[in-house]
Amino acid sequence: MKTKLTFILFFSLGFFFAQEKKDSIKPKYKYEPNLAIGVDVLNAALSAFSDRKLFQAHASTKVRRNISAVLDAGYDKNVYLKGGYDASAKGIFAKLGGFYMLSMDQENKDNGFYAGGKLGASFYEQEYKAVPIRAFGGADQYLQLPSSKQSSYWVEAMIGARVQLFKSNFYVDVNAQPRYLAYTSK
């Protein structure tokens, strides 16, 4: 009986001294400002040579180690002149979301591949100056519609890569953003 109690005593003391003393108060997450602001240079340059005028900027900040929040905002103006249609649309849009860094460069944590999602909204004005309709006897006629204000909402996935240009504060960011239209006003 004493042998059994002696073993229980030693094992109990062994478990007692083997425990790590952990601080019961967890440190709070402290946000450190790390805002990155970007401009869509490609579409802004193409706007000089086409009917579509698209100007877009974005801001992103690291929320946690691999997770970042992103906000995109811009202005889009487009003219459609095909198949007898004469239409134009112009307005603003905004997208809010986040992304996860899938792989990062060891030397620069901002370089790497990422994936994420966004919710988007657009508020625009559209006008149809000419809409082709088939008249009696096959004659061409055109219908004009008054301008109207519209809004659209969508869900967007994003996957891309970002690389720093040399040792500067500039980055090249290439991404694909497929969209799913959730709702549009009529």
Task: Briefly describe each language-model feature range.
Residues 19-62, 72:
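Short glycine/proline- and aromatic-enriched beta-strand/turn motifs that initiate or cap beta-hairpins
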Residues 35-37, 53-57, 92-96, 113-115, ...:
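Hydrophobic, lipid-facing positions within transmembrane beta-strands of outer-membrane proteins
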Residues 67, 72-139, 149-153:
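Gram-negative (and chloroplast) outer-membrane scaffold detector with strong preference
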Residues 20-33, 66, 103-112, 165-172:
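Short loop/turn motifs that connect adjacent beta-strands in outer-membrane beta-barrel proteins
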Residues 35-43, 61, 71-75, 115-123, ...:
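Transmembrane beta-barrel strands of outer-membrane/channel proteins
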